[in-house]
Swiss-Prot record:
A motif (YPX[LI] motif 3) lies at residues 655-658. One of its GO terms (cellular component) is cytoplasm. Residues 567-586 have a biased composition (Acidic residues). Belongs to the pacC/RIM101 family. One of its GO terms (biological process) is cellular response to neutral pH. A motif (YPX[LI] motif 2) lies at residues 531-534. Activated by C-terminal proteolytic cleavage. At neutral to alkaline ambient pH, the signaling protease (probably RIM13) cleaves RIM101 to yield the 74 kDa functional form. Also exists as a 65 kDa form at acidic pH, which may govern pH-independent processes. It comes from Candida albicans (strain SC5314 / ATCC MYA-2876) (Yeast). This is pH-response transcription factor pacC/RIM101. Binds to DNA. Interacts with RIM20, which binds to the YPX[LI] motifs and is required for proteolytic processing. Signal peptide: none annotated. Induction: By alkaline conditions. The keyword Ubl conjugation does not apply. The gene is RIM101. Residues 287-321 have a biased composition (Basic and acidic residues).
Length: 661
């Protein structure tokens, strides 16, 4: 509040009383610009202090006494600053207008709820204003109305959400406030927001109904529905029926191009033809898939690359394992044959050739029947049994007993396992390994010659068994003598309880290079051992010079050195472990493949020009041919027995039997 009052105004107040009255009357008719005073200045205690107060008269109308005459408790401002409690105003008897007051004054006090403020800064300068006794009666009402206006402004600014509610009671009693209150406004209508339903699994089962405007056609698949929308409803510019506004359930979407409206139609059709390669999600439009793919590229690029690398490694491992299994299955016949040969190479058991019965041969060779048949037919061709079987079919040799006798004599002469048969079987074995058959030779019916072939290969098998037994016996005798000769010096060396350590001589220090190191190790007359000793002091004598530092090194390791590895190697090892790639895995796989427990590198033993390993292979081949021939003989005998039974049955019956179809 501004309480600074110019003193000249109070000095001229008593002398110019008439002028002040004329001024008051003048302002009663027309409001001067000086009447626009602040509320704080107008409602100050000094402005409302009456000149009729006895306290002011006692002080001699002093401005200082008028400034301090009223206390702050009687001011209407303090009433406004207190809690809002609506006071109950009672009109006393003095509220009625007195006789000495004019009618204008009474009407002015009743018609104006808020009385006009004085034009001067102090009420003692305006006699008309000071002569109104009803001012203090209306003053609390004025303060209460001002307080209501302030509270209304406070509620309008601080509580905007309550301005549309209709308050009863307090505001309804104040007609002055309700006159200026605006009518409540209704909420504006928001535009309709388009929402699209998500496609569920049930939506993809159909049937699918066209909801374009008044069309009610039903389709079985969403693809046909989409084609119907594009062709019939959207149309084409060339057909003069192009429609770029979507009428699906009053969608109302309008586009500029036909491609845009056809792409928009996928939103309504439950069709998701665009699939993500990195996750199982599918999308209706290609732009949706493109937007989705960015999430994979931005969020998890490293994880995706790592997952792809791991997937590639897993696929490579599975492919390698499948390839290894296929190779093992393809070579199962050779592996089983080699294992049997390795067990029976040097056993010397005379019953080895008799342990191959028909059931074991069937079980061994049924896994790769094509290869077995090729081997058997090749062996029979080499021993001229195929030609002999075809001989009766040739017209030039039919009935010629000389050719049959010649072949029989040649067979009988070749039944012994000699060096010629050994070379022939070796040549055949090499041919089978280098030239694998592409197709199987057809089985041929040998007729009566199959018995001759079985007899020939049976005698040849017995001859090979005898040869193999004699050779294995000779090898065991030689091997036993060599092992005894090797064990004898070993036993002599083991007579000493503890082995002696080599020492280094004094005269070995003059050598240089590799001879110097050899002298350090091989000289046994010295006093220094060939192995390093940690922190051993060297002897010093006046006649012998101090030993050079090279004497302290043994293979690059010093006697004062605790570790021969540097710390850099450790760091390199850790980096190599981090950079572990598929190439290292391949190397490990190859190393593990080489760690097979087999005796492939068996030393070759040759006795009298026969290789013991080749003889074992030849024995297996002849046994295979012999087993095949025996199976053929059994089948022929079974067929003959069946035919004989049918003939016997037909001869015993007098009348033929009629069978029903």
């Amino acid at each position: 509040m501004n309480y600074n009052i110019h003193p000249v105004t109070y000095l001229n107040a008593d002398s110019n009383t008439g002028a002040s009255e004329s001024t008051a009357s003048h302002h009663g008719s027309k409001k001067s610009p000086s009447s626009d005073i602040d509320v704080d200045n107008a409602t100050s205690p000094s402005s409302f202090t009456s000149s009729q107060s006895p306290h002011i008269n006692a002080m001699g109308n002093s401005p200082h006494s008028s400034f301090t005459s009223q206390s702050a408790a009687n001011s209407p401002i303090t009433d406004a600053k207190q809690h809002l409690v609506k006071p109950t105003t009672t009109k006393p008897a003095a509220f009625a207008p007195s006789a000495n007051q004019s009618n204008t004054t009474a009407s002015q006090s009743y018609t104006q709820p808020a009385q006009q403020l004085p034009t001067q800064l102090h009420p003692s300068l305006n006699q008309a204003y000071n002569n109104q006794p009803s001012y203090y009666l209306h003053q609390p009402t004025y303060g209460y109305q001002q307080q209501q206006q302030q509270q209304q402004q406070h509620q309008e600014f601080n509580q905007p959400s309550q301005q549309y509610h209709d308050h009863h009671g307090y505001y309804s009693n104040n007609n002055i406030l309700n006159q200026n209150q605006p009518a409540p406004q209704q909420n504006p209508v928001k535009p309709f927001k388009k929402t699209y339903k998500k496609i569920r699994d049930e939506d993809l089962k159909g049937p699918f109904k066209c909801l374009w405007s008044n069309c009610n056609i039903i389709f079985e698949t969403p693809e046909i529905l989409y084609d119907h929308l594009c062709d019939d409803h959207v149309g084409r510019k060339s057909s003069n029926n192009l429609s770029l506004t979507c009428l699906w359930e009053n969608c109302g979407t309008t586009t500029v191009k036909r491609d845009h409206i056809t792409s928009h139609l996928r939103v309504h059709v439950p069709l998701k033809p665009f699939h993500c390669d990195l996750c199982p999600k599918s999308f209706k439009r290609p732009q949706d898939l493109k937007k989705h793919s960015k999430t994979h590229a931005e969020d998890h690029p490293k994880k995706l690359k790592k997952a792809q690398r791991e997937l590639m490694k897993q696929q490579q491992k599975e492919a390698k394992q499948q390839q290894k299994l296929a190779n093992k299955r393809a070579n199962s016949m050779n592996a089983t044959t080699a294992s049997d040969l390795q067990l029976n190479y040097y056993s010397g058991n005379p019953a080895d050739g008799l342990n191959y019965d028909d059931t074991s041969r069937k079980r061994r060779y049924e896994n790769n029947s094509q290869h077995n048949m090729y081997v058997v037919n090749s062996i029979l061709n080499d021993f001229n049994f195929q030609q002999m079987a075809q001989a009766p079919q040739q017209p030039g040799v039919v009935g010629t007993a000389g050719s049959a006798e010649f072949t029989t004599k040649r067979m009988k002469a070749g039944t012994e396992y000699n060096i010629d048969v050994f070379n022939k079987l070796n040549h055949l074995d090499d041919h089978l390994h280098h030239h694998h058959p592409q197709q199987q030779h057809p089985q041929q019916q040998y007729g009566g010659n199959i018995y001759e072939a079985e007899k020939f290969f049976n005698s040849l098998s017995n001859s090979i068994d005898m040869q193999y037994q004699n050779m294995s016996t000779q090898y065991q005798q030689q091997h036993a003598g060599s092992t005894f000769a090797q064990q004898k010096p070993t036993q002599q060396a083991s007579g000493q309880l503890y082995p002696s350590l080599p020492t280094i001589g004094n005269g070995s220090y003059t050598t240089s290079g590799s001879s110097h190191k050899e002298g350090l190790v091989n000289n046994h007359n010295g006093y220094l051992p060939s192995y390093p000793q940690i922190n051993r002091s060297l002897p010093y004598s006046s006649g012998v010079a101090q030993q050079p530092p090279s004497a302290l090194e043994f293979g690059g390791v010093s006697t004062y050195q605790k570790s021969a590895q540097s710390y850099e190697e450790d760091s390199s090892d850790s980096s190599e472990e981090d950079d572990y790639s598929t190439s290292s895995e391949d190397e490990l796989d190859t190393l593990f493949d080489k760690l097979n427990i087999d005796d492939n590198k068996v030393e070759e033993v040759t006795i009298d020009g026969f290789n013991l390993k080749d003889v074992a292979k030849h024995r297996e081949m002849i046994h295979a041919v012999l087993g095949y021939l025996r199976n053929q003989i059994e089948q022929q005998e079974k067929e003959k027995s069946k035919e004989q039974k049918e003939v016997d049955v037909n001869e015993t019956k007098l009348y033929p039997t009629i069978t029903a179809f």
